[in-house]
């Protein structure tokens, strides 16, 4: 009966293409121009078919190789809602499905898994009971069928089907001279108007967001007086706002950890590099020798680090991270684990001496020490190297004396001077620049690195604590290796050292939606952690809280923390679950399980959820907030991410004005403004500063913010722009860094209401804001603990600003701190000036902060 019913539906659809339409009905065509273009809609006009725009695109799998939509099929339910199915590729055992009420906003895609590796050309049909039937073909030409629930979230096991080929008959139209296949539908004029209005709004928004400060010379905002005069009326009315607005987000991206903040100078110290870390890498990457470097795994130091090198009467060299930079007179702590290997004849003395050296590019030895070892068991040996000259690029030499064989592992070299003098510590200059931000919290360890490249690469915090040799290394989603030397103990310790709240963020039971296909051909979220394994994963997250806050006398996890040198609890208050995930059914099921378990055992812990990788009106944002509001008891706040143009930030300064104050708080966890230069400059920093004045104004709903990414090492950029760039010998904060520092150091917990009024006379006599008002900003906050008040003023225009301040007493000689420059300047220097009283003068493209 199903075969007859659906064949009849196909005929009815074809007849609908030629029937005369009622006056209120409009005809649309839904199609896919090509596999990279996504789902499009066109309307019938007197001049023929006219393109309206893209409805949605594929979210499946990796960028580049995937994210393609093949053979989409669309059906409309009796209630007027829509269903979409499409083929993701020709090798994965899954279909892509999506739901929409209005063709404008689509729920995030789900990817139900089928029984065959080829799920080709799917088609979908509605049933009278509200469910849907989906048919697809296999590579061999077989046909299979699956039933979908009315909400398009539940799918039966697929079965063989005998449905006829007529089910795959498509409509064809010509648009822009090209013939395309798709589906015809009748919708009402009101529905069509809503769709076209949506695309009109998108086009207008896109146009205004193209505004750039660096274009001011040739396309200056109209009617700007010289100078600009304005008044700021401070009313004195206050409201409480978050005292944690400005923090930092640390992710091991662009060599931010190993080779960066983590002070270890030896690369591949554990001989555990593999091709999965990076194509072409092996256990000997960054090592070389006077003879071929021998690596074995018999009787290893640790099962988590099974490989080690074997030395006889030879020398091996390590290149470090683009070389090893040393300073004359500085001390460097060397260590390695050694086991002397018995000779086959049993005559070995089980003793071996080593000479450890730092060697310059011209072969000069500028530091040297001798290490004597004995015994067949693994043992740690240490030495101190003192550099006799400064050199940006040395290499480490480990020379074995005589012929006896010995295994060496975890070959390490740290500067004696680490941040706060910590063992296994952080690079002092880089950590200090971060500390100078005075961040109120630190989000770690990611980012995409938290949920990982596939299920096997999900970040497990418990693999990163304990003795270094027992920590479990892994590949990094950003294309290199994680030693885990910078682990959760070091993250928490750093937070404590700089007075910031720790905010660990871990996976919500799903990997990154951009994951490549696994052995079964399943990519993206890969179906999530199997439900049978979720209790163990949830326990792992509960153990983290126990490790951070528990009593060493009663908790094995807390005892591990105490054994590492921190008997007192870390006083963890926040935990993040998920990172810019697709808010799919697979995600929601696992996220809810995790949150309920944490809330049940640790009700005081504040959970931070996620609403996807982009702002409104993205599918994940809408679904994420809908889920959050339907489950208000699960989370304290949600994490929003968006990277946008400077024009977007300047024209969306009211973004949080209408957020529901009774709903979850907002953590703007990743954001940055950018221009075509793809580097932070004065333009991006001022756009971010303008936006942050409105974040402060909305600090009653926005709890936290953090710029992203924070760190990038020269020559290893996975992403641009970044807040801080660095090499082995220098740290280069950007204008974005200075904006973050000004808003953090001069932050408060009370917002003081004020009104900025620009003095412009309109020819019409109207009182409308001038068209350049979005380029000026001001904010007043007060720190209730210190009693200090801070005024921030931003002038993102090419003319000077004279601002008269009313309601605040600014004594003559009061210091104003800030920066200015040309929009394209990528380096700025903070300057301090004296004010002349209640009138402030700001140069073009500038920010000033006054402390009262």
Task: Tell me the role of every PLM-derived stretch.
Residues 211-483, 501-503, 518-532, 602-606, ...:
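Extracellular and organelle-lumenal recognition/adhesion modules and their flexible linkers in secreted
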Residues 244, 251-253, 511-513, 663-747, ...:
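Aromatic/acidic polysaccharide-binding cleft in carbohydrate-active enzymes
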Residues 394-398, 551, 561, 581, ...:
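Noncatalytic carbohydrate-binding groove/subsite architecture in carbohydrate-active enzymes
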Residues 771-810, 845-849:
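Carbohydrate-binding surface patches
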Residues 831-852:
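C-terminal beta-strand-rich structural cap/linker in extracellular carbohydrate-active enzymes
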Residues 1-24:
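Bacterial Sec-dependent N-terminal signal peptides
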Residues 414-422, 469-485, 522-535, 573-588, ...:
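The substrate-binding groove and active-site-proximal loops of carbohydrate-active enzymes
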Residues 21-223:
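Carbohydrate-active catalytic/glycan-binding domains of CAZyme proteins
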């Amino acid at each position: 009966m199903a075969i007859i019913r659906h064949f009849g539906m196909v005929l009815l659809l074809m007849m609908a293409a030629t029937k005369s339409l009622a006056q209120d009905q409009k005809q649309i065509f839904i199609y896919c121009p090509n596999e990279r273009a996504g789902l499009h809609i066109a309307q019938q006009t007197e001049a023929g078919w006219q393109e309206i725009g893209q409805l949605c695109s594929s979210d499946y799998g990796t960028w580049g190789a995937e994210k393609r939509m093949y053979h989409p099929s669309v059906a409309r339910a009796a209630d007027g809602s829509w269903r979409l199915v499409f083929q993701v590729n020709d090798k994965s055992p899954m279909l892509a499905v999506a739901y929409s009420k209005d063709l404008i906003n689509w729920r995030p895609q789900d990817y139900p898994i089928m029984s065959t590796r080829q799920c080709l050309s799917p088609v979908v049909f509605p049933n009278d009971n509200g469910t849907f039937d989906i048919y697809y073909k296999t590579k061999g030409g077989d046909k299979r069928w699956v039933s979908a629930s009315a909400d398009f979230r539940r799918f039966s096991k697929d079965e063989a089907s005998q449905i006829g080929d007529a089910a795959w008959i498509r409509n064809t139209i010509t648009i822009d001279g090209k013939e395309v296949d798709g589906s015809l539908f009748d919708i009402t004029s009101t529905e069509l108007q809503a769709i076209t209005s949506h695309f009109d709004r998108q086009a207008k928004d896109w146009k205004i967001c193209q505004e750039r400060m660096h274009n001011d010379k040739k396309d200056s905002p109209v009617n700007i007086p010289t100078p600009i005069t304005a008044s700021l009326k401070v009313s004195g009315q206050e409201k409480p706002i978050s005292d944690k607005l400005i923090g930092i987000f640390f992710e091991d991206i662009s060599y931010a950890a190993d080779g960066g903040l983590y002070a270890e100078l030896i690369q591949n110290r554990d001989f555990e590099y593999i091709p999965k870390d990076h194509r072409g890498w092996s256990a000997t990457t960054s090592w070389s020798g006077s003879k071929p470097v021998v690596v074995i795994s018999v009787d290893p130091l640790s099962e988590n680090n099974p490989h080690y090198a074997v030395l006889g009467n030879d020398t091996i060299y390590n290149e470090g991270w683009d070389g090893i930079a040393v300073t004359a007179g500085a001390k460097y702590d060397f260590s390695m684990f050694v086991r002397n290997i018995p000779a086959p004849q049993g005559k070995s003395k089980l003793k071996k001496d080593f000479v450890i050296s730092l060697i310059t590019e011209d072969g000069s030895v500028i530091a040297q020490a001798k290490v004597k070892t004995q015994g067949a068991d693994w043992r740690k040996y240490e030495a101190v190297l003192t550099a006799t000259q400064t050199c940006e690029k040395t290499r480490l030499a480990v020379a074995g004396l005589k012929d006896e064989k010995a295994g060496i592992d975890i070959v390490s070299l740290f500067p004696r001077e680490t941040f706060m003098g910590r063992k296994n510590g952080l690079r002092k200059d880089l950590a200090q620049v971060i500390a100078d931000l005075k961040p109120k919290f630190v989000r770690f360890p990611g980012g995409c690195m938290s949920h990982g490249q596939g299920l096997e690469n999900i970040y497990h915090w418990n693999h990163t604590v304990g003795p270094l040799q027992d920590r479990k290394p892994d590949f990094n989603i950003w294309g290199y290796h994680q030693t885990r030397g910078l682990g959760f103990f070091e993250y928490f310790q750093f937070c404590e050292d700089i007075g910031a709240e720790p905010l660990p963020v871990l996976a919500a039971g799903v990997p990154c939606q951009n994951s490549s296909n696994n052995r079964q051909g399943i990519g993206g979220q890969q179906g999530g952690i199997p439900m049978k394994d979720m209790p163990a994963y949830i326990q792992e997250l509960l153990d983290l809280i126990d490790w951070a806050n528990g009593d060493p006398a009663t908790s094995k996890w807390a005892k591990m923390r105490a054994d590492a040198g921190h008997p007192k609890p870390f006083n963890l208050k926040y935990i993040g679950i998920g990172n810019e995930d697709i808010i799919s059914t697979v995600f929601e099921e696992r996220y809810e399980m995790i949150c309920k378990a944490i809330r049940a055992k640790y009700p005081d812990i504040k959970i931070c959820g996620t609403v996807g990788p982009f702002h409104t009106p993205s599918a994940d944002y809408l679904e994420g907030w809908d889920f959050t509001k339907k489950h208000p008891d699960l989370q304290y706040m949600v994490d929003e991410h968006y990277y946008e143009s400077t024009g977007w930030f300047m024209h969306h300064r009211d973004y949080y004005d209408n957020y529901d104050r009774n709903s979850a708080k907002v953590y703007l966890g990743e954001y940055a403004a950018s221009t075509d230069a793809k580097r932070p400059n004065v333009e991006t920093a001022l756009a971010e500063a303008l936006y942050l004045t409105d974040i402060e104004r909305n600090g009653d709903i926005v709890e936290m913010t953090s710029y992203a990414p924070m760190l990038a090492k020269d020559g290893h950029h996975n992403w641009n722009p970044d807040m801080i760039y660095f090499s082995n010998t220098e740290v280069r904060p950007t204008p974005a860094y200075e904006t973050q520092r000004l808003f953090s150091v001069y932050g408060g917990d009370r917002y003081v209401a004020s009104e900025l009024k620009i003095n412009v006379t309109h020819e019409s006599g109207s009182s409308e804001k001038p068209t350049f008002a979005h380029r000026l900003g001001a904010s007043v906050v007060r720190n209730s603990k210190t009693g200090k008040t801070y005024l921030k003023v931003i002038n993102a225009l090419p003319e000077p600003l004279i601002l008269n301040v009313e309601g605040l007493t600014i004594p003559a000689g009061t210091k104003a701190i800030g920066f200015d420059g040309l929009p394209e300047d990528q380096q700025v220097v903070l300057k301090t000036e004296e004010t002349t009283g209640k009138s402030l003068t700001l140069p073009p493209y500038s920010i000033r902060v006054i402390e009262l």
